[in-house]
Amino acid sequence: MKVKIKKLVENAIIPTYAKDGDAGMDLTATSKTYDEHGNVVYGTGIAIEIPKGYVGLVFPRSSICKTDLLLTNSVGVIDSGYRGEIMAKFTYMHMHNKKYEIGDRIAQLIIMPYPTIEFEEVDELSETERGEGGYGSSGK
């Protein structure tokens, strides 16, 4: 599937798969700023045109465990109508460990289809083995 991409800055890097069979394409930082709360905002210098019926999801890379960073919205959602720069905002858990710099791969992008959902209000839901069991209900 082809997706249109626009470089917004000269040093932008087109996302690629690191290895054959990977689901996520690496996003690379081209800018680094801080918001009013001290969170670090990385720009990728790219904008994409996601087809209707698809969504872009921005996840932290697995190597984030080597940093003190936490993606502030857990998973970024890029709707098909968005045409702005893809960015990732992180909060610092501690101030004394590795942080990402410009040129580092900061996150990963997955583009996937999604169904359009229409809710049907009912009085009862079907029975299941789990039922209403929530947190911890499946055991240790």
Describe the predicted segments one by one.
Residues 1-140:
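DUTPase catalytic domain/fold
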